[in-house]
A protein has these predicted regions:
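Basic, amphipathic alpha-helical patches used to engage nucleic acids or provide basic targeting signals
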Residues: 18-24, 46-117
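Solvent-exposed, charged helical/coil patches
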Residues: 1-42, 102, 118-119
């Protein structure tokens, strides 16, 4: 009988834990502003599994996913758009994409963008 530890979900959870230990600079900056309900009292989770994906940040009560897009995402527009549609269809979430350069250059501007999606 296969072990539950061999399941794809377990692998994603393990990977998400590892990703939390080594955030990108922009993810680290944004997490500092979001953690412990610091931004508008909203609870965010980081590197959260929404099977089959791991999202950068997730606000469950608002059903909002926040993705910080760095250089890796610049040529992945179609793939990212399909992923966003999957997340919306399967989980009923909205996806906000924020450029990593904006987070690093002007965190307050990035938070204003995010705030515009929180209502």
């Amino acid at each position: 009988m296969p072990s539950p530890l061999d399941s794809p979900l377990f692998s994603l959870v393990h990977l998400a834990r590892e990703m939390r230990k080594a955030p990108t600079p922009s993810e680290g900056l944004l997490w500092g502003a979001l953690r412990d309900r610091r931004f508008r009292g909203v609870k965010f989770r980081r590197q959260h599994v929404l099977h089959p994906y791991i999202v950068d940040f997730y606000a469950p009560m608002q059903k909002l996913v926040v993705e910080v897009d760095g250089a890796y995402h610049r040529d992945r527009g179609e793939v990212d758009a399909a992923r966003d549609l999957d997340l919306a269809a399967y989980y009923g979430v909205r996806v906000v994409r924020i450029d990593a350069a904006l987070v690093e250059r002007d965190l307050l501007a990035a938070l204003r963008v995010l705030g515009g999606h929180l209502g």
